[in-house]
Regions:
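Catalytic P-loop NTPase motifs of RecA-like helicase/translocase cores
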Residues: 154-157, 190-191, 374
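Conserved RecA-like P-loop NTPase helicase motor core
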Residues: 306-407
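Conserved C-terminal RecA-like helicase domain
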Residues: 45-76, 80-81, 90-95, 107-109, ...
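Structural recognition of the conserved hydrophobic beta-strand(s) that form the central parallel beta-sheet
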Residues: 97-100, 146-148, 179-186, 334
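Interdomain helical connector at the RecA1-RecA2 junction of SF1/SF2 helicase-like NTPases
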Residues: 166-289, 413
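Walker A/P-loop NTP-binding motif
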Residues: 1-12, 33
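SF2 helicase catalytic motif II
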Residues: 103-106, 113-176
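Conserved Walker A/P-loop ATP-binding site and its immediately adjacent core
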Residues: 12-58, 100-103, 271-278
Length: 418
């Protein structure tokens, strides 16, 4: 968009600025992942020297501030200030802003008695004013493309979020500033079947989102920009047996693996519940680490939100955010209700799903793929996926239904085309 917009600045077909929206429920894993947009290399798409020229034009803002900035002279909304620094907005070119859709864009919008949404435009309430201030400022961004990540969360939502978002975008579009609205999803499926009317007497139902415009096959990414996976089903459904086999296989293969960027190979274990993590998985993994000469206190990261019996592990949130840094010495990441989608940890080299409910049934494929992002060269990098018999079956079913490939083809990726 930026390349062609630079050639034809008055052509409304091409965006000058971009707003990336992430779902609220996934902010812990999604927002940090979206920060990697800053590392994108324009030469992946555009040849030099145009690529370097585009990189110099890019401006990146994370609109992630939740509290008012009391000392600001321009605004009491720090997210508005991040946009205001780029004024005059009419001439703005190359802004990429990332924000949490529900918490920021959809904040302080209520449904009135007539079923319409009330933006409280005339309200004197400070929170209403602050929320509208940001929406109004975004609405002034010229030639804006809106990119909605994990869009299936909006489409499948039982709340009014999708309708709210459409209402907000329509408001912006009324100003003539919206170029495109694009949604992205690795799992474009609805929670409930959608009825599509074909004629007055005929309709079809589908669980797949009906407005998919472009599809990129997973198999094309394997060995291209995704690690080559090895999928193993233990044939057992005993958690301890599966975890032990998975950890032993991981340490036997990747114990000494340090990637070219200085990060060490890691494995994620999805535990289902906090109690399972604390009482079953952690003691077992700790014992195995000691057996392999690895210090458990340095190697194991427990990450969950805590409960009455087991509080959230101190410092875990910060450590989770820095797992992909060379200074992180964590090798095993124990997870409860996080990291199933959108988690960007390139040094994650394996995952274990030892029980059926360690992740939702419909997300076995997506969770299994968490360990596939390449570090430097996907052709030379491998990953380990350890599953119990039931999750192996779910993975096979989802690959065939969603990607039209078998587990064997999944493990071959681009090799099957060569």
């Amino acid at each position: 968009d930026l390349y062609f917009a630079y050639q034809e600045p008055d052509n409304k077909a091409f965006a000058h600025n971009f707003m990336v929206l992430a779902p609220s429920g996934l902010k812990t894993s999604i927002i940090p992942s979206l920060r990697t947009i800053q590392e994108f290399d324009p030469s992946w798409v555009i040849p030099e020297p145009a690529a370097s020229n585009l990189r110099r034009m890019l401006k990146f803002e994370m609109l992630d501030e939740n509290r008012s900035a009391n000392k600001s002279n321009r605004t009491k909304n720090p997210n508005v200030q991040k946009i205001a620094v780029h004024e005059p907005l009419a001439d703005l070119f190359g802004l990429v802003a990332v924000t949490n859709a529900e918490k920021v864009i959809l904040d302080r919008i209520d449904k009135s008695t007539d079923g319409l949404f009330d933006f409280h435009d005339e309200s004197e309430d400070e929170k209403d004013r602050v929320a509208n201030e940001l929406r109004n400022k975004i609405g002034k961004l010229p030639h804006l493309s809106i990119l909605i990540d994990e869009v299936h969360h909006v489409a499948s939502s039982n709340s009014d979020d999708e309708a709210k978002l459409r209402t907000v975008v329509n408001r912006w579009a009324a100003n003539g500033s919206i170029t495109t609205v694009l949604g992205f999803s690795g799992t474009p499926y609805l929670d409930k079947k959608e009825k599509v009317e074909v004629t007055a007497k005929h309709q079809i139902t589908m669980t797949e989102m009906s407005n998919i415009a472009y599809y990129y096959p997973l198999a094309n990414g394997i060995g291209n920009f995704l690690k080559v996976p090895k999928v193993i089903s233990t044939g057992s459904n005993v958690r301890s047996e599966i975890v032990e086999k998975g950890i032993r296989s991981f340490f036997d293969t990747y114990k000494d693996t340090v990637y070219s960027n200085g990060t060490c190979a890691k494995i994620g274990i999805y535990c289902g519940t906090i109690e399972t993590l604390e009482t079953e998985v952690y003691p077992l993994v700790s014992q195995l680490c000691q057996e392999y000469g690895i210090n458990p206190s340095e190697a194991i990261l427990k990450f969950h939100e805590g409960n009455k019996q087991y509080p959230e592990p101190q410092g875990a949130r910060a450590e989770f955010a820095t797992l992909d840094k060379p200074f992180s010495k964590r090798r095993v990441v124990l997870l409860v209700q996080i990291g199933k989608e959108g988690w960007d940890c390139k040094s994650l080299t394996g995952i274990i799903l030892s029980q059926e409910k360690d992740c939702p049934k419909k997300m076995v494929l997506q969770t299994s793929c968490r360990c596939l992002r390449e570090v430097a060269n996907a052709r030379q990098e491998t990953a380990l996926i350890y599953l119990n018999a039931q999750n192996y079956k779910y993975l096979d079913e989802q690959l065939q239904k969603q990607q039209h490939i078998t587990i064997e083809q999944f493990q071959q990726g681009r090799k099957q085309e060569e």
